[in-house]
Amino acid sequence: MAKKLVGSMKLQVPAGQANPSPPVGPALGQRGINIMEFCKAFNAKTADMEQGAPCPTVITYYQDKSFTMDIKTPPASYYLKKAAKLSSGAKTPSREVVGYVSSKQVREIAEAKMKDLNATSIEAAMKIILGSARSMGIEVK
């Protein structure tokens, strides 16, 4: 018989740095998920990613206290800030330009994000990344 689904939740956890402290521990604990088991599994799955990169994670948990997790690639904003060497985006993106990225960097970001984007071609994925860059006040040269 199939496991009975109880619910799902979304967390953004730094790659390779999941630990039982807040916000991860309490969020999992109140749903009855084994916190240490999650931390070990998450850190093992994200070992090959850049340490500290924020990873959006969808955790589906079942009645028997088991869980599955779907780890996505870091957000486009993380990659864009890293490429432009910024700490944050523009306060007024339509009027202020805070950094620049090359079209080659946009292509690399689109290739890295391709599996999580709703795009069929690399060009469509690049347009999505360009929109994110524009909304952050980052210009493409």
From Swiss-Prot:
Keyword rRNA-binding annotated: yes
Acetylation as UniProt keyword: no
CDD domains: Ribosomal_L11
PTM per Swiss-Prot/TrEMBL: One or more lysine residues are methylated.
Alphabetized GO MF terms: large ribosomal subunit rRNA binding; structural constituent of ribosome
Pfam families: Ribosomal_L11 (PF00298), Ribosomal_L11_N (PF03946)
Gene Ontology CC: one annotated term: cytosolic large ribosomal subunit
InterPro entries on file: Ribosomal_uL11, Ribosomal_uL11_bac-typ, Ribosomal_uL11_C, Ribosomal_uL11_C_sf, Ribosomal_uL11_N, Ribosomal_uL11_N_sf
Key words of the record: Methylation, Ribonucleoprotein, Ribosomal protein, RNA-binding, rRNA-binding
Entry-linked SMART domains: RL11
GO biological process: translation
Complex and partners: Part of the ribosomal stalk of the 50S ribosomal subunit. Interacts with L10 and the large rRNA to form the base of the stalk. L10 forms an elongated spine to which L12 dimers bind in a sequential fashion forming a multimeric L10(L12)X complex.
Family per record: Belongs to the universal ribosomal protein uL11 family.
PANTHER family: 60S RIBOSOMAL PROTEIN L12, LARGE RIBOSOMAL SUBUNIT PROTEIN UL11M
Job of this protein: Forms part of the ribosomal stalk which helps the ribosome interact with GTP-bound translation factors.
Name of the featured protein: Large ribosomal subunit protein uL11
Organism whose genome encodes this protein: Roseobacter denitrificans (strain ATCC 33942 / OCh 114)
Lineage, highest ranks first: Bacteria, Pseudomonadati, Pseudomonadota, Alphaproteobacteria, Rhodobacterales
